[in-house]
From Swiss-Prot:
Membrane topology, from the record: Multi-pass membrane protein
This protein's record includes keyword Protease: no
Name of the protein this chain belongs to: Phosphatidylglycerol--prolipoprotein diacylglyceryl transferase
Keyword Transferase: yes
Species in which this protein is naturally found: Haemophilus influenzae (strain PittEE)
GO cellular component, one term: plasma membrane
Main location: membrane
Location of the protein in the cell: Cell inner membrane
Top enzyme class: transferase
Family: Belongs to the Lgt family.
Length: 268
C-alpha cells in the first residue's frame, strides 16, 4: 500500500439499525430522502409562481409517483442490468432492498412511467411534466453519489493522480479515482446549474427534458472512463454504463432538435 495517498476510514453505511436486524436507516437512504425533500421544496417554489400551471397538490402527487418510480425502477434496473445472474440463481434477491443496489437508468425508466401516469391523470401534456421534473433531479443524483462514497462502493480505476484515494474494502488497496465524487460534481451540481439557468430563458417545450438526457448521458459517459466497471465491457470498448448512456444522448439530441423545430411552442 502506498502511504502517499489518502486512506479512507471504514464508514459505517448504517446510521442506526433496529436491534440485530438489517432494518434501519442508511446513509444512502438518507441521501435519497434529502434529495426528495429538496426536490419538493424547489418544485413547490416553482409551482407558487404566477401562471406556473401547477398546484401544490399536483406537485405532491407527481413527486409521490416519482418516488415510487425511482425506488421500483432503480431496484429492478440494478438487478436486470447488473445482477441478472444473481437474480436467476436466487429470484428473491430482487426484494432484498436492504442490501442496497439501485440503478440510475432503471430509476429513470421508473420516473418516465410515473410522469406518463401523472400526465394522464392530471390531463397534462407529457412534455410539460418532463420539463418540470428534469431540473429537480440532478441535486438528488449528486447526493446519491455522496451516498455511494460513504458506502465505499462504485469506486474508480487505479490511478496515480495526487487526489487518488485508497478504499479500505478494496482487496488490493490500490490508489483509485474517487469517481463517486466526480459524478456528484458533474451529474449533481454542474447539471443542476445548467438546467436551472436554462429554464430562466424562453425555450420550446420538451427542450429541458432533452437537455437533461444529453447532460447526464455525456457526464456519466465521461466518468465511466475512470470508474471501475461493475460488469464486463461491451466488445471490450465501452462499459455497460456507457452503453446505457448512448441512447440517452441520442434520444436527448433528437428531442432537442424536435423541440426547436416547433417554433410555436415557446415557453417564456
Amino acid at each position: 500500500m502506498n502511504s502517499n495517498y489518502l486512506l479512507l476510514p471504514h464508514f459505517d453505511p448504517s446510521i442506526f439499525t433496529l436491534g440485530d436486524s438489517n432494518i434501519g436507516l442508511r446513509w444512502y437512504g438518507l441521501m435519497y430522502l434529502l434529495g426528495f425533500v429538496f426536490a419538493r421544496w424547489l418544485a413547490v417554489r416553482r409551482a407558487n409562481r404566477p401562471n406556473s400551471g401547477w398546484t401544490v397538490d399536483q406537485v405532491d402527487s407527481l413527486l409521490f409517483n416519482g418516488f415510487m418510480g425511482v425506488f421500483i425502477g432503480g431496484r429492478v434496473g440494478d438487478v436486470f442490468f447488473y445482477n441478472l445472474d444473481h437474480f436467476l440463481q436466487e429470484p428473491l434477491y430482487l426484494f432484498r432492498v436492504w442490501e442496497g443496489g439501485m440503478s440510475f437508468h432503471g430509476g429513470l425508466i421508473g420516473v418516465i412511467v410515473a410522469m406518463i401516469w401523472t400526465s394522464y391523470s392530471q390531463k397534462r401534456n407529457f412534455w410539460q411534466t418532463a420539463d418540470f421534473v428534469a431540473p429537480l433531479i440532478p441535486f438528488g443524483l449528486g447526493l446519491g453519489r455522496i451516498g455511494n462514497f460513504i458506502n465505499l462502493e462504485l469506486w474508480g480505476r487505479e490511478t496515480n493522480v495526487p487526489w487518488a484515494m485508497i478504499f479500505p474494502n478494496d482487496p488490493l488497496l490500490l490508489p483509485r479515482h474517487p469517481s463517486q465524487l466526480y459524478e456528484a460534481f458533474l451529474e449533481g451540481l454542474v447539471l443542476f446549474a445548467i438546467l436551472n439557468i436554462f429554464i430562466k430563458k424562453p425555450r420550446p417545450m420538451a427542450s429541458v427534458a432533452g437537455l437533461f438526457l444529453i447532460g447526464y448521458g455525456v457526464f456519466r459517459f465521461i466518468v465511466e472512463y475512470v470508474r471501475e466497471p461493475e460488469v464486463e465491457n461491451f466488445f471490450g470498448i465501452i462499459t455497460r454504463g456507457q452503453a446505457l448512456c448512448l441512447p440517452m444522448i441520442i434520444g436527448g439530441a433528437f428531442i432537442m432538435a424536435w423541440a426547436y423545430s416547433r417554433k410555436s411552442a415557446v415557453i417564456k
